[in-house]
Amino acid sequence: MTAGTGLTALNTLQLHASAERLVTVTSSDQLRAEIAALDEGAVPHVLGGGSNVILCDHLPGTTLLMAIKGREVLSDDDTKVVIRVGAGESWHDFVVWCHHQGFHGLANLALIPGSVGGAPIQNIGAYGVEVADCIEAVHAVHRQTGERACLSLKDCEFRYRDSVFKHEAGAKWIITEVDFVLDREAPVEANYPTLRARLSKAELTHDAVLAAVISIRRERLPDPVITPNVGSFFKNPVISQQDIDILRQNFPEVPVYPASNDAVKISAAWLIDQLGWRGEERDGVKVSDDHALVLEGCGARSAAAWLALAADIAASVEEAYDVSLELEPRVIGAAG
């Protein structure tokens, strides 16, 4: 346990936030003990890889740093494999390990920063795959009571970049382990346009997809170790077919992708780019020159500067297109 700890090294925006009390958690039993020791009514903050969060200047009370490790093969019938993974494991390292073991399904999600425990919260996705496609169950502990729970795929309520864990009903849970079901004989998933354009028919192998995904991400997204960022700062808006028909009357070239039955997903990057935001810099935060959906730090060390630029971008998109943008990273602490 460390009191008055700086969190700069624990978030990829490199924000100069601090925690009143920081505790590294390495087991679910320790987690439950820490929760039991909290003052009545106290709710801890939780940090994982810090790659999809915006930390406000000071986090009062207790902040738990999730460091539960471990990979355990629960079952293996030579086709399907079920693996239980600690929430504190590196996401990318886990993906690469699965690939080398011949456990397929996650290669398209390679090089996404963060931890295994953060993957279900956001329902991370890339290049035509979402992590929900490979999750069997999520194990968690109640933030206030220490109660254990195992949430099924249905319980998790996965949607585009969303899950029950981002809402009141699920935010009470702290994820400790995730059970994945992977497939030794899974077909290659290379239908996403960016990925398909990179690969020839002769290269439609799991090895080629993994290499291509890593290469594309390195080309398109800045390394957070060098340039503070959280990847995509906004979700791609999901709107009804009726709304896209109206939008296309004035903006026929807006990129559209399938989402669900009567909804489509539109490119937030395109909306932002068309309004001239690329390269714009304010108070130490800049819209990337290479990707309008990525905000980069160039001196800003507080959440306020990031949130202010994001709010201005969202307001301009709302005014121009009557489309609402949602932040992809979660804000932790009280923004002020």
Predicted feature descriptions by range:
Residues 2-3, 8-15, 53, 148-296, ...:
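Phosphate/pyrophosphate- and phosphate-bearing ligand-binding catalytic cores of soluble enzymes
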Residues 301-317:
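His/Asp/Glu-rich mid-to-C-terminal helical/loop segments that flank catalytic regions of hydrolases
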Residues 34-40, 193-195, 309-313:
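Short amphipathic alpha-helices in soluble, non-transmembrane regions
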Residues 1-145:
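Anion-binding (especially nucleotide phosphate/pyrophosphate-binding) glycine-rich loop
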Residues 40-43, 314-321:
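A common structural junction motif
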